[in-house]
Amino acid sequence: MGGMRLGFTPFNAELDYEAAFPLAAELGLDLEVAYDLHEAFPLPGARELRATGEALGVGFTLHLPFVELNPASLIPSVRKLSQERLLRALEFGEALGAKVGVLHTGLSPVRHPVAERLAWEALEETLALLRDPPLPVALENLALWERALVRGPEELRRLLERHPHFGFCLDVGPALVELGP
């Protein structure tokens, strides 16, 4: 996946793209494009963003969809829709020229051994579907969510060992919360 480069999500910083591009160029940062927002709002398309990024020397990462999405859903129709959205997002990321797509691994809202086993099987199905993506995919740590299927660094490490073609995206905030005081 190459070396590490820092980036930021403009919308988390309450910046539109017009303000975010010059800041990213000045600081030598990538922009993390949140695909969910491009599904929900009238925002510039992938090719327009790519052209602006190329003109200013700004690269991109793509945060794959996570709003109302669960790649580990126990409900087959929800999982199928989640998979379809992920594939569309990867096409968007390819057109954007994104260096990587960042993936949340899903939720397990039902804490029962059978439900958790089925959720893990569902996640494995989704990850198999993403085995040959048009851009690298990195799995993100999610310690902040009690309902996260993958909990803790050891579970994430084991998942990445089973799927070495995926990278890892460290979200420092959840990692610090998980470490505790």
Q: Over which residues does each language-model region extend?
A:
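Active-site-proximal loop/turn and secondary-structure-junction residues that shape catalytic pockets
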Residues: 12-14, 35-37, 66-68, 105-109, ...
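N-terminal pre-domain/capping segments
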Residues: 1-88, 94, 167
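A short alpha/beta connector and helix-capping loop motif
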Residues: 179-181
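Active-site acidic/histidine proton-transfer and metal-coordination neighborhood
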Residues: 75-167
